[in-house]
């Protein structure tokens, strides 16, 4: 079940706090609509993400979730623990560079040890950026304001994108 929830989050791009607040009424005309909790106090912005086949399949699978909730949710800690376990079982253990919050130094850690719900949002934004390369368009789907500095933390120019850019010089 938590694998499905993580995949849903990967194709919707919302924060886990917003995922928990989604209800069946959040689905409007084939899209999920919500006001991000993090920005509710500022200028409320309605985020609308069209549902793809994967998201629709997951919603259908859990259509009988009790109450008005769109999907079954567990506590943040249990969800993050489940994500780490899923990554371990799937063999997603490649080393990644992270910033140690205590020392402020870069360090290598296995992906399965650092994976969390926020990785789904990073995947959503990063995968869209590889396809579209338009931060303003992607920002409309992720809830980032135009020119957002926070958005820059999510997009990654990977090796394939670097190769593609260099071929433009020829």
Stretch-by-stretch model annotation:
Residues 1-2, 75, 79, 117, ...:
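Hydrophobic (often cysteine-bearing) scaffold residues that line and stabilize catalytic clefts
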Residues 1-16, 20, 77-78:
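Basic, Lys/Arg- and aromatic-enriched nucleic-acid-binding interface segment
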Residues 12, 21-60:
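Conserved tyrosine-mediated DNA breakage-rejoining catalytic core shared by Y-recombinases
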Residues 21-27, 129-131, 139-146, 153-157:
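A short, basic/aromatic helix-end/turn motif that makes direct DNA contacts
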Residues 38-40, 79, 142-167:
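Catalytic-site neighborhood detector that most strongly recognizes the C-terminal catalytic loop/helix
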Residues 45-57, 61, 152-170:
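DNA/chromatin major-groove-contacting recognition/catalytic segments
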Residues 64-69, 84-140, 144:
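Short, basic (Lys/Arg/His-rich) helix/loop patches that form interaction surfaces
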